[in-house]
Amino acid sequence: LKLELSGITKRFGALVANDAIDLVIEPGEIHALLGENGAGKSTLMNVLYGLYTADAGHIELDGVKQNFSGPGDAMLAGIGMVHQHFMLIPVFTVAENVALGHEPTKALGVMDVATARKNVVEISERFGFNVDPDALIEDLPVGVQQRVEIIKALSRDAKVLVLDEPTAVLTPQETDELMEIMRQLAKSGTSIVFITHKLREVKAVADRITVIRLGKVVGTAKPDASTSELASLMVGREVILTVDKKRAAPGKVVLAVEHISVLDDRFQKAVNDVSFEVHEGEILALAGVQGNGQTELAEFLLGLRRPLGKDGKSSLNGKEISNATVRQSLDSGLGFIPEDRKTDGLVSEFSVAENLMLNSSYKSRFTKGLNINFAARTK
């Protein structure tokens, strides 16, 4: 399918998220939408996918104007989208998730599980996805869950596949594997729109690049464009790609962890005899492939998990927090941003002010008798 977006404008109140955007995606092309966070890339693709209705402009597929009233219409027209936050049901199998919404049925409307499995196996084998149709989503690593989302789109005969920040949750190895999958899909005739702000990945896999800044298309480029040229288009000024980093002068120890072991949710040892110190004014990186204990260690420091055995201990600003509650850890000066901010960090139905006061709602300035003092939210 040849996809053409003409004059797409989308407003949210006074904010113009997309301003008269023109975009052409050729059949079998990997087309990168490059821009900073908040540039309007995802909004544009949500218009394409039928999640938003454009205030102006139109969409054409192979020269035929489209009018999508929702994602169902977009999918029927051959548009698929893999969102940054996956749309999967954790307690369902791969086959059940892929079939959801267009389930193959037998007599009396009973789901044909064998056919659902077969569809997953066929797509998986065709593109080398190596996905078990009977595996539960909650048991799969993030990279495999992303492949399930791609299989789900392909099972609905997607001819244009939108990938929204697909590498944000992937390891470098998984990123390389995804790029190879993208190349295979493009070779089979599928057009791919790759939303990202990562220049290295764009140059490695894209056939063509469109740069969006502040809701407008500011340029197009080939992947052989220089990194500095692309970066300047993204931000609207010259970008210095090298930084003279001054050597840090760390102060006293503020966080000390000694011989800590922690179990994961399956009662397996995720953290084994770990010790480290963080000094005042220091940035300490804990590197490793996802699933190797980093999350469990962070949750222990917050007070969500207890240490294993009696030998391990941790202290914050000289105060032991080995068995502290979450409130005690926060009151001791620990800040925490969870791995999955959408699921574990924010309440999407709450306002910004309400989210900001969540972990402080028990403090006197936010209380009024036994109730929360909502008037204090914006002070």
Tell me what each language-model feature is:
Residues 1-379:
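Glycine-rich phosphate-binding loops of nucleotide-dependent enzymes
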